Design a protein with these regions (language model features):
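Short regulatory helix/loop adjacent to the ATP-binding pocket of P-loop NTPases
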Residues: 136-152, 166-168
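Conserved lysine of the Walker
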Residues: 52
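Hydrophobic anchor at the beta1->P-loop junction of P-loop NTPases
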Residues: 44
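Short glycine-rich substrate-engagement loop in P-loop NTPases that contacts/grips substrate
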Residues: 69-101
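Pre-Walker A adenine-sensing motif
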Residues: 19-36
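Hydrophobic positions on the alpha1 helix immediately C-terminal to the Walker A/P-loop
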Residues: 55, 59
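Interdomain hinge/linker elements that couple catalytic modules in large macromolecular machines
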Residues: 2-17, 22, 161, 165-240
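Structural recognition of the conserved hydrophobic beta-strand(s) that form the central parallel beta-sheet
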Residues: 127-133, 154
């Protein structure tokens, strides 16, 4: 990709990334902030749509402010992106922001041989924070290049406490001993159990969101990644 093509992707993505959004602070955020103080590459993995990109935004607001470069590899404009293009990204990001201290790469597994480029960024003293939907795949590939120099963080969908924060439901220590409040908490727990903790689904309530997550996991993370030829039989197996 040319430098101009990269600029047309990097600039708007970073503008969106740095826009403040009213989101639920994830309970893992304090732990992640401590890990960010280490020299290790951080790998945030977890279910698709569990909120990994939002967690990146939260840690950026907490620690880095305007010292970051962000790139999401699920952008259709990056379909032709290859590992060789990381050099252009490196040069472009310094051209746009010479105060860069950290790079955030979202869904990095979409680029083959990405781990080679990450070694260079890390070697040049930049903090590197990655997300991906396949924990074992990311750890295995990065481990071949940065043995002992990366840390894995798994992000799960909302916990019950995070769900209550999303619903703006305040809970006091003794609420379980007050019948009316205890009944309300039981109802909230039942709703959380039945709906799950996917932030996007909770926000919009559309069943299509959950169905699309299922399809993405099935196709992108399993069938394509592992070269499964008999898709029909695999789908039947997945429905069991």
């Amino acid at each position: 990709m040319t430098r101009e093509e990269l600029r047309k992707v990097i600039i708007p993505q970073n503008l969106r990334f740095t826009e403040h959004e009213d989101t639920v602070p994830r309970s893992i955020l304090p732990e992640l902030a401590k890990l960010a103080e280490t020299p290790h590459v951080l790998i945030i993995t977890g279910l698709r749509r569990a909120g990994k990109s939002t967690l990146m935004k939260q840690i950026n607001e907490m620690l880095y402010s305007s010292k970051q470069t962000y790139l999401n590899f699920e952008d259709e404009k990056l379909l032709s992106f290859t590992a060789e293009d990381f050099s252009g990204v490196y040069e472009t990001m310094l051209e746009l922001n010479d105060k860069v201290e950290v790079v955030f790469f979202d869904e990095i597994q979409n680029v083959e041989k990405w781990e080679i480029a990450i070694r260079r960024y890390h070697g040049d003293g930049l903090k590197v924070i990655l997300t991906g939907s396949n924990a074992s795949f990311l750890s295995r590939e990065l481990g071949t290049k940065l043995t002992g120099r990366h840390l894995d963080i798994v992000l799960y969908p909302f916990s019950f406490r995070e769900y209550l924060t999303f619903k703006k439901t305040e809970v006091a220590r003794n609420d379980l001993y007050v019948p009316v409040k205890a009944a309300r908490l039981r109802k909230e727990f039942s709703d959380d159990f039945n709906r799950g903790g996917i932030p996007e689904y909770l926000r919009y309530g559309r069943e299509e969101i959950v169905k699309q997550i299922y399809e993405d996991i099935l196709i992108k993370d399993i069938i394509v990644r592992y070269g499964i030829g008999d898709e029909r039989s695999f789908r039947e197996l997945a429905r069991l």
